[in-house]
């Protein structure tokens, strides 16, 4: 829950007047600064009166609502399952490679003999 939801649009917090700090076993009293850009140590939080919705919240707010009686209990469309995907990798054995290379060599030598 945000601060603006509890206390309203504007919240002002005032730090304590005196603070104590111990340095090397000695107690030192510190006072808030009276100058600077914060106006004397006062913190002001301003909240937007109309905050902007983020992605999914905005989508859920603006999407069409089911108002028709037949549409209220309707589920998502059912499609037939997709066919299985082909394998990305196929295993090729070295014996098949040797047979392919020897057959291609003999066929190429036969082609050379025919052309000569």
Swiss-Prot record:
Keyword Zinc part of the UniProt annotation:
no
Q: Which family does the record claim for this protein?
A: Belongs to the chloroplast-specific ribosomal protein cL38 family.
Localization per Swiss-Prot or TrEMBL = Plastid, Chloroplast
Q: Where is the transit peptide?
A: 1-47
Q: How is the quaternary structure described?
A: Component of the chloroplast large ribosomal subunit (LSU). Mature 70S chloroplast ribosomes of higher plants consist of a small (30S) and a large (50S) subunit. The 30S small subunit contains 1 molecule of ribosomal RNA (16S rRNA) and 24 different proteins. The 50S large subunit contains 3 rRNA molecules (23S, 5S and 4.5S rRNA) and 33 different proteins.
- What name goes with this protein? Large ribosomal subunit protein cL38
Disordered: annotated span: 95-116
Matching Pfam families: DUF5323
Main localization of the protein?
plastid
Task: Say yes or no: keyword Endoplasmic reticulum present.
Answer: no
Reported function: Component of the chloroplast ribosome (chloro-ribosome), a dedicated translation machinery responsible for the synthesis of chloroplast genome-encoded proteins, including proteins of the transcription and translation machinery and components of the photosynthetic apparatus.
What GO CC annotations are associated with the protein? Answer: chloroplast; ribonucleoprotein complex; ribosome
Q: What InterPro entries does UniProt report for this protein, alphabetically?
A: Ribosomal_cL38 (IPR020526)
Q: Which UniProt keywords apply?
A: Chloroplast, Plastid, Ribonucleoprotein, Ribosomal protein, RNA-binding, Transit peptide
| Record-level Gene Ontology MF annotations | rRNA binding; structural constituent of ribosome
